[in-house]
Regions:
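N-terminal cap/lid subdomain of alpha/beta-hydrolase-fold enzymes
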Residues: 72-141
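Conserved acidic catalytic loop of the alpha/beta-hydrolase fold
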Residues: 153-173
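Conserved hydrolase catalytic core segment
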Residues: 171-210
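Alpha/beta-hydrolase-fold enzymes
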Residues: 195-279
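Active-site nucleophile elbow and catalytic-triad environment of alpha/beta-hydrolase enzymes
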Residues: 288-304
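Short beta-strand/loop motif that positions the catalytic acidic residue
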Residues: 308, 314-316
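Conserved alpha/beta-hydrolase "acid-adjacent" motif
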Residues: 321-328
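Catalytic active-site module of serine/aspartate enzymes centered on a nucleophile-bearing elbow/loop
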Residues: 340-376
Length: 376
């Protein structure tokens, strides 16, 4: 399966991107390189590929003649005597991230090695780059502000087609995701209730984006859209509003204690945020971020929670500014999921606010327990 560039669109030169420096899933955590190579962690490097979806139609009515979905896989699929794949695991990243942003010591290093919960000798692990992210088709490839407006439902549909058509996976042992990927997990359970044995959404809520979670997203969206240097998405240099976006992402991505430890006085705070923004201005794209945040507008799993048939374990953290437990949403809504359970990780020295979703040591015991549930 070959990669592509959008038809009829010349690419403007851009600096090289660091896919491990992701926005909400990992950029919100920290703009850091991926940890040591996979082999050093005891699991093999991923196999990478591109799946091309022809004439993909978005819920908006827009379409692309070719939609590229990039992916990484670990391990090999195994089917039973009836041809049903029994060991596939789909893991979906957060906003602005990529599948590669999860191939790092604190996530894959805790899960993919020998004897670990998702040992790659036992499981076939699929890490896709969502629409608009990583090396999948995205605005900065060339269409810029003319890229189709995608939503979370479009992203889930593309993931489903990648598994079923591209990788010939007809069943999943587990579907899980972090942040945006966690929200996708809820949608997967509703839209394809018989496809998986188990579900694990991390750092997400089964409800429409609202309150502070909507407002911080709107702050970034409005800053970019009302920036005259954005030029309707046709800029040649990143608009100044990307700085505002990066500052907001830094604010929301961790907990106040960690941020204070990183920046304990005025001078140090300015140094830290200046360095973070300077790096992001070289690696991030305003259109890509704008589209990625706007994509959450169609997220509304609430009405369909009773459709989820598989055992589901939702995990959030008490110091998550984006999904604060004080709202009581997770505790209230999990009762509507027939086989749903939820846990909130208490605030402690090794939690990372919203970014706790990437630190598997905090929650992998819940994954172990979930994987002990029977296959369906």
């Amino acid at each position: 399966m070959n990669g592509l560039r959008e038809r009829g669109c010349a690419q403007r030169p851009r600096p090289a991107r660091a896919t491990a420096a992701a926005r909400l899933g990992t950029l919100l955590t920290a703009l850091l390189p991926v940890a040591a190579p996979a082999l050093a962690a005891g699991y093999p490097p991923p196999v990478e590929g591109d799946f091309i979806l022809k004439d993909f139609r978005f819920a908006s009515g827009e379409s692309l003649p070719q939609l590229r979905i990039h992916y990484r896989t670990f391990g090999q699929p195994r089917a039973d005597a009836s041809g049903v794949v029994r060991n596939a695991v789909l893991i979906m990243h957060g906003t602005g991230g990529s599948g590669g942003s999860l191939v790092r010591e604190e996530f894959a290093g805790e899960l993919f090695g020998p004897g670990q919960p998702l040992d790659t000798t036992r499981y076939f692990i699929v890490l896709p780059d969502g629409i608009g992210h990583g090396r999948s088709s995205k605005p900065s490839d060339g269409l810029r502000g003319h890229f189709p407006h995608y939503g979370y439902n479009d992203m889930v549909q593309a993931q489903y087609l990648l598994l079923t058509q591209g990788l010939k996976v007809n069943h999943a042992r587990l579907i899980m995701g972090t942040s945006m990927g966690g929200m996708h997990t809820w949608l997967w359970g509703e839209q394809h209730p018989q496809f998986m044995d188990a579900l694990m959404p991390l750092a997400s809520l089964p409800a429409q984006i609202s309150g502070r979670n909507r407002v911080w997203r709107r702050t970034i969206i409005d800053a970019i859209r009302h920036d005259p240097d954005w030029k309707g998405g046709e800029y040649q240099a990143e608009p100044p509003s990307l700085r505002t976006a990066l500052e907001m992402l830094w604010l929301m991505g961790s907990n106040p204690v960690l941020r204070y430890q990183e920046a304990p006085n005025l001078a140090r705070a300015d140094e830290v945020i200046d360095a973070y923004v300077a790096h992001g201005m070289q690696t991030e794209d305003a259109n890509d971020l704008l589209y990625a945040l706007a994509a959450s507008s169609d997220y509304d799993p609430g009405p369909g929670l009773a459709k989820i048939a598989a055992p589901l374990m939702a995990v959030n953290s008490a110091d998550d500014l984006i999904n604060p437990p004080e709202l009581g949403i997770l505790e209230r809504e999990i009762g509507r999921v027939p086989h749903g359970r939820a846990a909130v990780i208490p605030f402690r020295e090794n939690t990372h606010g919203h970014g706790s979703h990437t630190h598997a040591v905090l929650w992998k015991q819940h994954l172990d327990e979930l994987l002990r549930s029977p296959q369906r």
